[in-house]
């Protein structure tokens, strides 16, 4: 006599499963759409957190990243120029202040970066299944 296992119906994850964050024990490498949804969630979170990004206007992912970089540099400058920090950490001789690149300069490189962006997904995939934004 042979043992038979019951046949399970194969069901694709519905959009509601993704929006609820329900995972069917797949890693991002196994499910590229899940990785895409997670990345889009991360971009949405960044858009909410950075005050210089207009909330009522659609912005590209590249623009979001540019605003994030600008915001981080602004915060670094604010920290570096705070009187308490300045008195604690005197600038070493020969060490220059980091200069900030304006967004307009970064926008000129978008075409180059967008051509290279097609290579990123395969390079960034890892076996790490942690969700970075959430």
Swiss-Prot record:
Residues 23-75 form the bHLH domain. One of its GO terms (molecular function) is transcription regulator inhibitor activity. One of its GO terms (cellular component) is protein-containing complex. This is DNA-binding protein inhibitor ID-2. GO terms for biological process: adipose tissue development; adult locomotory behavior; astrocyte differentiation; B cell differentiation; bundle of His development; cell development; cell maturation; cell morphogenesis involved in neuron differentiation. Coiled coil: none annotated. PANTHER family: DNA-BINDING PROTEIN INHIBITOR, DNA-BINDING PROTEIN INHIBITOR ID-2. Pfam families: HLH. The modification Phosphoserine is found at residues 14, 25. The keyword Repressor applies. Phosphorylated in vitro by CDK1, PKA and PKC. Ubiquitinated in a ASB4-depedent manner, leading to proteasomal degradation. SMART domains: HLH. Keywords: Biological rhythms, Cytoplasm, Developmental protein, Nucleus, Phosphoprotein, Repressor, Transcription, Transcription regulation, Ubl conjugation. InterPro entries: bHLH_dom (IPR011598), DNA-bd_prot-inh (IPR026052), HLH_DNA-bd_sf (IPR036638). A motif (Nuclear export signal) lies at residues 106-115. It is found in: Cytoplasm; Nucleus. Transcriptional regulator (lacking a basic DNA binding domain) which negatively regulates the basic helix-loop-helix (bHLH) transcription factors by forming heterodimers and inhibiting their DNA binding and transcriptional activity. Implicated in regulating a variety of cellular processes, including cellular growth, senescence, differentiation, apoptosis, angiogenesis, and neoplastic transformation. Inhibits skeletal muscle and cardiac myocyte differentiation. Regulates the circadian clock by repressing the transcriptional activator activity of the CLOCK-BMAL1 heterodimer. PROSITE patterns: BHLH (PS50888). The bHLH domain is essential for its repressor activity towards the CLOCK-BMAL1 heterodimer. Interacts with GATA4 and NKX2-5. Interacts with NR0B2. Interacts with CLOCK and BMAL1. Interacts with IFI204. Interacts with NEDD9/HEF1. Interacts with ASB4; this interaction promotes ID2 proteasomal degradation. It comes from Rattus norvegicus.
């Amino acid at each position: 006599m042979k043992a038979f296992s019951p046949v399970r119906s194969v069901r694709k994850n519905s959009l509601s499963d993704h929006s609820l964050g329900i995972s069917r024990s797949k890693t991002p490498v196994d499910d590229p759409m899940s990785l895409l949804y997670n990345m889009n969630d991360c971009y949405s979170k960044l858009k909410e957190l950075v005050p210089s990004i207009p909330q009522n206007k659609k912005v590209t992912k590249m623009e979001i990243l540019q605003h994030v970089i600008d915001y981080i540099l602004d915060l670094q400058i604010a920290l570096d120029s705070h009187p308490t920090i300045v008195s604690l950490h005197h600038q070493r001789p020969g060490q220059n202040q980091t200069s900030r690149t304006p967004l307009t300069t970064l926008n000129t490189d978008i075409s180059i970066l967008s051509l290279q962006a097609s290579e990123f997904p395969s390079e960034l995939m890892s076996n790490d299944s942690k969700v970075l934004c959430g």
